[in-house]
Amino acid sequence: MNKKLLVDVRPFEISRQKIDESIKENNGKLVVKGVLQRAESKNQNGRIYPREVLLREVGKYLDTNVQERRALGELDHPESSVVNLNNASHNVVEMHWDGDDLLGTVEVLSTPAGNILKELFKSGIKLGISSRGLGSVEPVNEKNGEDGTVEVQPDFELIAFDFVSNPSTHGAFMRPVNESVQNKTPENNIERIINSIMRG
């Protein structure tokens, strides 16, 4: 099996009132909560994440990244399997399961990318939360394999959760859930160029 970068997006919405309350209650920091990932459910990219694979990876992520306050994520789709500290915008501070939904609490950082993320939220922009990992997929035999459904394999490794502008799953706004595969598309190139200009 050939491992590739897998990116799965869920919409993440938060009201202006909730943003203001969060900033007030958290000493000026924006802290948001919602769905980070969903197990055993086909996303808009046609991928299904088996619960046992996500349980294992989330457990490792909690024990290392979250507990050590290094569960950093980036703003937009990175083209790398590592988190670039120059682009860090937020830190996942807590995660837990509610059935097949992985819920989490995310602190927006006071970094250049974090400040952009905070202003996007304050302006009412809908963003997606995106899981990033390395792994392989295998076709699932639904409708004779014609629908393109694939299942993420046990070699999956969770890398990070990133905020993105193009959620590919219904409800992936840190309340609902969404996902997508990392492909070099014209949309990704345009977003990368715009972000490069914004970051200077």
Language-model region placement:
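Polar/acidic, low-complexity leader/linker segments enriched in S/T/G and N/D
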Residues: M1-T64, Q182-R192, R199
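Residue microenvironments linked to proteolytic maturation
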Residues: D8-P11, S15, I23, V31-G34, ...
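Short, flexible beta-strand-to-coil junctions
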Residues: L36-K42, D76-E79, R132-E138
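Short, solvent-exposed loop/turn motifs
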Residues: I48, S81-V82, T149-V150
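A broad, low-specificity signal for short, low-complexity segments enriched in glycine/proline
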Residues: V53-Q67, S89-M95, L120-F121
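Short conserved beta-strand and strand-loop elements enriched in small hydrophobics
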Residues: K60-V83, I129
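Extracellular-facing segments of soluble proteins and assemblies that are Gly/Ser/Thr-biased and enriched
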Residues: N84-A88
